[in-house]
Amino acid sequence: MIRGGALTHVALGLTVFLLLAVVHSQEKCSKTCIAQKCNVLGIRYGKYCGIGYFGCPGEPPCDDLDDCCMTHDNCVDLKGMTYVDCHKQFQRCVNELKQSIQESNNQKVGFSKECPYSTVIPTVYRGMNYGIFFSGIGNIIIPKKPASAGPVVEVDLARSKADTKDGLGTNQGPQTKDGSKVSVPMNPSPS
């Protein structure tokens, strides 16, 4: 159980995280590769790396790390800030980059000499750990909506030679209507 002081810290941290995430919609997009505050959570790296910092649509990333950040930004734009898989996908991308750097005998250093990968990668990785933590809290506070019944497909089997014994691959028996027409739910409940 979380006690008073710890709960205050969690609430404050979540508030700061969400406020910084809102900044994303209020700032202008970047067309320039920059490297600022490379060893703190307020980092701005490339065109896409940093909380509330993002590149303009169609702008190419500055390097491989910026590409990971661009992919993360696109995922979060589609799925939402609390979608943890976006953050985990980012960490996998960064881990692959770290492996590539090791294989190059540390010859890969990124676009910035002032902020080499050796400084920037731990910073963005640490920031993403916070993102995963706060996304988990956000998902507890704002639970996901239950899934609605999915669409139903209706097929006239008189025209095909489909085997309907197992519900057309859905593991649900088809519901026969009007002779040879059947309907099967597209999002069957797990069996």
UniProtKB/Swiss-Prot annotation:
Organism superkingdom: Eukaryota
Catalytic activity: a 1,2-diacyl-sn-glycero-3-phosphocholine + H2O = a 1-acyl-sn-glycero-3-phosphocholine + a fatty acid + H(+)
Major subcellular location class: secreted
Family membership noted in the UniProt record: Belongs to the phospholipase A2 family.
Entry EC number(s): 3.1.1.4
Species per Swiss-Prot/TrEMBL record: Arabidopsis thaliana (Mouse-ear cress)
Residues in the signal sequence: 1-25
Positions of the catalytic residues: H72
GO CC entries: endoplasmic reticulum; extracellular region
Protein name: Phospholipase A2-delta
The UniProt record lists the keyword Hydrolase: yes
Binding site for Ca(2+): Y48, G50, Y53, D73
UniProt region (Disordered), positions on chain: 161-191
Keyword Hydrolase (UniProt): yes
